[in-house]
Every structure is written in C-alpha cells, then in structure tokens.
Amino acid sequence: MNLNANDRRRQARRRLPRFVFDYVDGGAETEDCLRRNEADLAALHLVPTALRDTRHADPGITVFGRRWAAPLGVAPVGFSGLVRPHGDTLLACAAAATGVPHVLSTPSNDRLEAVREAALRRDPEALQWMQLYVMGDRAIAEQLVRRARAAGYSALVLTVDAAVSGLRERDVRNGFRLPFRFTPSTLLDLALHPRWSLAMAMQGRSPSFVNLAEADDGATSPQLQAALLSRTMDRTLAWEHLAWLRRLWDGPLLVKGLLHPGDAALAVRHGADGIVVSNHGGRQLDAAPSTISVLPRMVDAVAGRIPVFVDGGFRRGSDVVKALAAVAGHAPDRGARGVLAGLVDDIARTLVLLGADRVDEVAPHHLLANLPFPGSAGLSHAGARHG
C-alpha cells in the first residue's frame, strides 16, 4: 500500500530498471550530502501545544500574489520522461490538481508549451514556473526564456549550482551516461523490467530533450541533444548577469542553488525576487551541508526582503513544518498527485497536532532541535521556556 513518499520510492525501486532508479535516487560521490538532508531533518523534533482552537486549520499560503494550497511545490526534475512517458506533463498536472506550483526543468522531455497546456486543462489557475540553465551559448537560454514567457509560465528559476556536473558514482557503476549506450547488463536489466520497457517501446522513441532541441536547430538526434546538454555550463555567469535576465523576463526571478548567506544577500542586492536554498538534492557537492542546517542563516541574510524557498530531504509534511519552525522569527514575515495530496494533508494534520491554525502560527517554541546548526540551541531553549 502506497501511503507516503517512502512507499512510492520502494515501489519505484521494484518497477524501474536499476540504472533508471539509481539515476533518480542517487547523489554525488559517497552520497553523504544526500543522507545529511534527511538525517538533519530527522534530528529536529516538533513540540505540540495543547488546548488551542484548530477547527479552521489551513495550510495555504500566498506567494507572489498567488494562493498555494500548502507551502510546498514540485522542484525541477530533469529527464523525468525516463521514469515514465510524459513524466513532465504528469508532474505538472499533479501539481495543478493539488494547487501547488510545478517547476519545469530545462532538460525536460515534453515541450514546455504542451506541459503548460496540459496543466491549464487540469486547472485554469495552474501555477507553473520555468527552471533555467545557462550554457555557453546564451542564445539558447534567451530562446527558452522567451518561449516560457509566451506560454504563460509565471516565474523563472535560474539554477546556479551546476557549473560542472557532480560525480554520480551510481551512474558510473551502472554505465549510465549520455548519449545512452546499451550493454549486456543494461539489456538484462530491461528484460527484468518488462512493464517499463514496454511503456518506453510504445513511445516509438527514446526520451529526448525537446526544448533544448528546439533552441538549437542542429540538435536533431538524442545523441546531439545529449552533447548539447553536456556542454560546459557558462562559467562566466556572474551576479551582474541577473540584469540580462531581467531584461528578458518581467515576472518573478529566483536564484536556485544557494547555501552561503553572502550569496543570499547578493541575490537581494542584484534584484532577485526570491532564492531557493538547495544543494541539488545532494547530487553536486557531496561535502555540502544539508539545506535545513543553513536555512536560518539564509533567511536572516535576506531579512524579509524576498521569499526564501528550500529543498532537499523533505519526505513528510512534518518536514515542511520543521523548516517553517526553524526560521520563524528569523526575519519579518512577508507573507505525483497522490504524494502531493498526502503532503498537503500531512501539513494540515501536523498544524492541528501542534495547536496551530495557519502556517504563520508555527513558531520557534514548536521546535526541539538536536542539530548543531546556528540558532539550534536557542530553538531548544525556546521550546523549554514556552508556557
């Protein structure tokens, strides 16, 4: 029975070829960062408060003038079409049905216009953002931005933590690389997973990076598209280049992949409308800290001037509430469908159990921190002093 994200992960392990599951599930090198993301969240405990009227508990929030069903969204997932045909579209529709935003990845396998249209059919108010990698040829990025704007994407998310790709040792061991090459072991893997293999075969083609292909007329085959994606990212990209993107994009502009408070302050200074505290799910720098451990400092650095988002290790709605409690009071407040719906329900249930009606009522005194990050001792003491 699939009751939560961990159940879905176990199901995916059974149903997907190993090289596909490991690509999605794995991290960089020894995967210490990947494990830290979850372990550091688990080290935080929530302390309920009693005898509060929670009849009208509502996990909804308003961000950039739009109402979200809960403080969560779908982060960009590259190559999701490898997991299931039209995976990008399915994720977007699940987010639309749940009332939370979906961020489409640059290396997605469905046309960004088609994904947007499908989400709008599910919900005319669907929240959709576009993630952007900037490669050496900036004309590719410019075309993607123009297409996203024309299609109705409401926010642009510039990812800045992938100047080079992390060393994904699971992928190396599995021989998984782009362009993909079949080996005896992968052929056996495919034979042992006929359901997945049949679904891919029925597409009549391998998943391809269609949006990159349309941005580069020469990338007409999966091999050429893979070569395009694997080009070195633009290492000359600097904070000053946010002005270049601002000229192309008049909606909210977020910077994703920040872990240092100094970078958070620079994002504000250079006109970003939001930041995403992210270590790329532990898939880039294995020595990086968990996102929850640096989150309070990042929130302090922006001082309430822009929204702060975070990813990495979140598996339960209670994990989301822990993040809210960890940063409550640090700065002025500015205000696949089954998994997402479960997370929304989980957040609402956790609020009631804590004795809170809304997410902005979650406070430091709700958190007992057994984690050595800045402010954790204060949070623990606040919990002890409350009442």
Regions found by a protein language model. Name each.
Residues L72-A75, H102-L104, Q128-L132, L156, ...:
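Hydrophobic faces of well-ordered beta-strands that scaffold small-molecule active sites
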Residues M1-G65, P179-L237, E361-V362, L368-G387:
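An N-cap/entry alpha-helix motif that binds or orients negatively charged groups
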